[in-house]
């Protein structure tokens, strides 16, 4: 937790005083004695994970192939190919199970 000096706006440091710890400013003579335990927790809001494959819309007009699903053993899967690495390496094939109850995704 970072507190700022009300006089000059610089960050306050914690130092030992004669009777207790205190917040003190290195620039001006401002001092604030700490009389109780000071805690403050803030949890950042996590943003939603972006679907790098474009979400559900990316799978609307793709072809299917005879690739069995490793999860439910359905005999067909939708597929698309994307260039995920440098141009001199082969494209990565992404699969999605054709079984609507499964929908498992994997890559080759």
UniProtKB/Swiss-Prot annotation:
GO terms for biological process: defense response to virus; DNA-templated transcription; innate immune response. GO terms for cellular component: DNA-directed RNA polymerase complex; nucleus. CDD domains: Zn-ribbon_RPC11 (cd10509). A zinc finger (C4-type) spans 5-28. InterPro entries: DNA-dir_RNA_pol-M_15_CS, Rpa12/Rpb9/Rpc10/TFS, Zn_ribbon_RPB9, Zn_ribbon_RPC11_C, Znf_TFIIS. Core component of RNA polymerase III (Pol III) which synthesizes small non-coding RNAs using the four ribonucleoside triphosphates as substrates. Can mediate Pol I proofreading of the nascent RNA transcript. Anchors into the Pol III active site to constantly monitor transcription fidelity, cleaves mis-incorporated 5'-ribonucleotides and restarts the transcription process. Once Pol III reaches the poly(dT) termination signal, can induce Pol III clamp opening and transcription termination. This is DNA-directed RNA polymerase III subunit RPC10. The gene is Polr3k.
């Amino acid at each position: 937790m970072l507190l700022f000096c009300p006089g000059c706006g610089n960050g306050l440091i914690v130092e030992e005083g004669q009777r207790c710890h205190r917040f003190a400013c290195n620039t001006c003579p401002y001092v604030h004695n700490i009389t109780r335990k000071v805690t403050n927790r803030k949890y950042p809001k996590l943003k939603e994970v972006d679907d790098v494959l474009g979400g559900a819309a990316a799978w609307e007009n793709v072809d299917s192939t005879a690739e069995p699903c490793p999860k439910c053993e359905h005999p067909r899967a939708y597929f698309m190919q994307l260039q995920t690495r440098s141009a001199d390496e082969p494209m990565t094939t992404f699969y999605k199970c054709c079984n609507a109850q499964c929908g498992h995704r994997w890559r080759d």
